[in-house]
Amino acid sequence: MLWRCNWVKQRKRILNTLSFSSIHGQYPREYTAAKPLTHDNVYSCLRESPADLKTLNFFFWCAKQNNYFHDDRAFDHMVGVVEKLTREYYSIDRIIERLKISGCEIKPRVFLLLLEIFWRGHIYDKAIEVYTGMSSFGFVPNTRAMNMMMDVNFKLNVVNGALEIFEGIRFRNFFSFDIALSHFCSRGGRGDLVGVKIVLKRMIGEGFYPNRERFGQILRLCCRTGCVSEAFQVVGLMICSGISVSVNVWSMLVSGFFRSGEPQKAVDLFNKMIQIGCSPNLVTYTSLIKGFVDLGMVDEAFTVLSKVQSEGLAPDIVLCNLMIHTYTRLGRFEEARKVFTSLEKRKLVPDQYTFASILSSLCLSGKFDLVPRITHGIGTDFDLVTGNLLSNCFSKIGYNSYALKVLSIMSYKDFALDCYTYTVYLSALCRGGAPRAAIKMYKIIIKEKKHLDAHFHSAIIDSLIELGKYNTAVHLFKRCILEKYPLDVVSYTVAIKGLVRAKRIEEAYSLCCDMKEGGIYPNRRTYRTIISGLCKEKETEKVRKILRECIQEGVELDPNTKFQVYSLLSRYRGDFSEFRSVFEKWKSEFTENVDVSDSDDELFVSVG
């Protein structure tokens, strides 16, 4: 055993003294003379090699051998290698330059492989750098490269950039369309359905059809947005392309009719389904129950539930979650708790929606003392999503010590804490009366260069504003602008609210004007917040300017804001004359019960 250990050490010493050419030059030729490359042997060589340029060059060398293509293991391993190289050489250009010096011939394949490594590793900034670097070497990206870059743009939410790449693909293949469809369906908005229609039409026009999985996504999007007529067209396409209509497709169509506010058509379709011999399953019944509950047709929902029980169908966790939610909405909190406690007997594992529903039930019933008891059964055996949910619920109901305890358990379990986790943590600290600790932790998180979004910055700033720490909040916001951290319209609106509350109305007005120069446009809430502050200070000229802007942009103000503007400007003859038609329309909307409380007080950024 001792001899073996010594030999391993000696072998490593010998290998380390060999030149690059002996390992990656002569060795491959001798090796291939004996037998061809295999995935297992290449992966073994890569895994045993250091993360340096020689290993990367060897990876490229293998890729250009006849009839050899790297498998997923090799690509996944190379993610760590290129990450180390980018830290060492800082840029892709320098890595390419060093590869040339080491004798690697720079061809389009090198860029394509590098792009795929960064793409697989979700290192999107470097993937973009590789893609743009192709042109400097005179290489034109092929369809595969453009497909990957389109996917990157979608994942970075640069939809216009993704579509521009899609349009620029000269020879689109199945994956070009599939990537675009997948992302549009995942985004899930009604506007994304337009994108799906455009891509699907082009796809069929070029002789391609979606697979079963993608058809399911498209159908789900149509039904989720209540576009049932489009959903039936998708079903027609599925049948034409040879894909059978399953019971799950029927269930989605039933759900779609409910979402479009047509319960009778949903029931008719359900009956039609039975007539043609397609037996409904638990998913179908759950769609019916949820549809009735959402429309307030509770009696009908419980009739369907009784049918489920009479047919002996065992409820799954989705149906149990729905029943907990339904009982909570009806104020039948004891029955909601009974469903929750029955899960163990049914051998069902609670998920994030289960805990969200039961915690909501306990909070609404005022049984706050039961919250720790319900969650005690979870112990420390929960995943990142459930941990985020628990800490958020605890934070919202004022149990900040419990929230921080859950977060400490998550940290101890070495979870890959995400932006949402950090947001909940900082908000819990602020609500728990520890704003200084929150600010200190905020700076530490930023220093570690985590992937943080605009919501993270907005939440800490808003939490400080709610504590009355206006100047501190504004200072953090200005630092975000200076450091070019991601900010959105909510971030600016929160900062404007802080300035309004701090009576720094001139700065609030300037910030409202400046945000448009940065490409971020105010929304209804932004206008409501700034107008409320301006009306309090009787800044008539600025209110006039903002009102003109709202009219020009077609922004519909809420009744309270309209009342404040009308009360301020209608007393001036010139203003009344300029906005007469607008004011006349507003007057018909006013009631005696219009609440003229501070509009900016209603703005709060939830971490949920």
From Swiss-Prot:
InterPro entries: Pentatricopeptide_rpt (IPR002885), PPR_P_subfamily (IPR050872), TPR-like_helical_dom_sf (IPR011990)
Mapped PPR repeat ranges: 107-141, 142-172, 173-210, 211-245, 246-280, 281-315, 316-350, 351-381, 383-417, 418-452, 453-487, 488-522, 523-557
Keyword terms: Repeat
Domain of life: Eukaryota
UniProt similarity note: Belongs to the PPR family. P subfamily.
PANTHER family: MITOCHONDRIAL GROUP I INTRON SPLICING FACTOR CCM1, PENTACOTRIPEPTIDE-REPEAT REGION OF PRORP DOMAIN-CONTAINING PROTEIN
Name this polypeptide is given: Putative pentatricopeptide repeat-containing protein At1g16830
Protein's organism: Arabidopsis thaliana (Mouse-ear cress)
